[in-house]
Each structure stands twice: as structure tokens, then as C-alpha cells.
Design a protein with these regions (language model features):
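Conserved class I S-adenosyl-L-methionine
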Residues: 1-37, 39-47
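Class I SAM-dependent methyltransferase SAM/SAH-binding core
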Residues: 46-94
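Short conserved loop adjoining the S-adenosyl-L-methionine
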Residues: 94-100
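A conserved beta-strand element that flanks and buttresses the S-adenosyl-L-methionine
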Residues: 107
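A short glycine-rich, Lys/Arg-flanked "PGG" loop and its adjoining helix->strand segment in the class I
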Residues: 121-133
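C-terminal alpha-helical "lid/dimerization" subdomain adjacent to the S-adenosyl-L-methionine
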Residues: 140-189
């Protein structure tokens, strides 16, 4: 996965240019900004900082992390409100526990779909540790839309779905990409968070909750 995204760093944001998705993209962006306004945000898997760039002006502060240096190189070349955004090369699993009040929100865009179903519960527990209990978690991701989404190549025994994607060098690679239903999200999140809210339009979904 790291090599896949390293190759895509310069072209990753093309996925946001699909004409049929623009209205839904604006809608989901507005909702993200509403939730993250005045928050001290930890962003995991920030990638090229497409979303960082958009919510940083309304957030109180942002610490944006990713484990892929080519992605961070693109991210750090952008312009942000002075003094608001810090970047760190870090794997989510290596992030230190938050100090009291360090963060009030955690944001992850198009990350949850790349987490194996068997790993999701432990990941939520880890997020609570690195951001602090009572932190608002905000996730956004893709819906599967026939004719717009890359087709699903296979499904494993645990229900994880995979796509075949073309690399910049012309090779093809299998990528985990899950498309959870509302009921699946509530079942997974329910035992470890509170105040779950889910929004969907045609192309995207958004989940907010409070980490226990």
C-alpha cells in the first residue's frame, strides 16, 4: 500500500475531478468544515493534504500525519494559514498517546476503506489512545457506485473487497477497498464509541462519533 501511494503522490487528487461527483464533494466538504470548525485536529493518513488544505482555515490547529514521504512532500508544498498546520511522517500505529486536551477531533479521509475488517475494532481503540477519550472522530469515504467506482475484483472470506488498480508505471496492483453499509458501521463502532451519526449522498459517506 505504501508503494502504491508513493507512486500516486503527484496524481492522487485527480480522483476529486470526476465531473459527476462535484456536487456531492462540495456537500461532504461543507459538512466536514462544520464539524471541524475551531477544533484541534489530528489528521491520520493525510496524503497530499487535499482535505487538510480545505479544513485548516476553520480549525483551531491541525497536526497532519502520513507514513508516505512522497505524499507529505506534495502536502508540505501547499499554502496554509500561518502557524496552524504541522506535518509529521508517522505511521498511525506509532503515534504517541495524546496529552490531556491536545486534540478535540480526529479526521481521516478515505482511510477507513483500506482497513481490514478484522483490524477495525483494535484500530478504533488505538485512535482513542492517540487522540484521547471524548475526541470527535470524523471519517469520510466512498460509496460504491456502478459505472463510476473501480469494479470489485474479489471478496475474501471475511467480506473484505479488493480492486485492481493501474499504477503510474503501468503495472496493476490489488488494493483493499471496503464499502461498509450503515448497519455494518454501527455494528462495528457501537461498542467502542458514542453519538454515532452517518450521512450519505450518492458518492460519499461521512461518520461522526465520540471516542470512548
Amino acid at each position: 500500500m505504501r508503494e502504491y501511494y508513493a507512486q500516486r503522490a503527484q496524481t492522487l487528487e485527480k480522483v476529486y475531478q470526476k465531473p459527476e461527483r462535484q456536487q456531492d464533494l462540495r456537500e461532504i466538504q461543507g459538512k466536514v468544515l462544520d464539524v471541524l470548525k475551531d477544533q484541534r485536529v489530528l489528521e491520520v493518513a493525510c496524503g497530499t493534504a487535499y482535505w487538510t488544505e480545505r479544513f485548516a482555515p476553520v480549525a483551531a490547529s491541525v497536526v497532519a500525519t502520513d507514513y508516505c514521504q512522497p505524499m507529505l512532500d506534495v502536502a508540505q508544498a501547499k499554502i496554509y494559514p500561518e502557524g496552524k498546520v504541522q506535518f509529521a511522517l508517522a505511521d498511525l500505529h506509532d503515534l504517541p498517546a495524546a496529552t490531556a486536551g491536545q486534540y478535540t477531533a480526529c479526521f481521516a479521509g478515505f482511510f477507513w476503506s483500506h482497513v481490514m475488517r478484522d483490524d477495525q475494532t483494535s484500530l478504533l481503540g488505538h485512535l482513542s489512545k492517540v487522540t484521547g477519550k471524548g475526541t470527535t472522530l470524523v471519517l469520510i469515504d466512498n460509496n460504491y457506485v456502478e459505472g463510476s467506482s473501480t469494479v470489485i475484483a474479489r471478496t475474501d472470506l471475511e467480506g473484505n473487497t479488493f480492486q485492481l488498480r493501474k499504477q503510474e508505471d503501468g503495472s496493476r496492483v490489488e488494493i483493499l477497498k471496503n464499502f461498509p453499509t450503515d448497519s455494518a458501521l454501527r455494528k462495528k463502532f457501537g461498542p467502542v464509541v458514542r453519538d454515532i451519526r452517518i450521512f450519505r449522498n450518492t458518492y460519499y459517506w461521512m461518520l461522526t462519533c465520540v471516542l470512548k
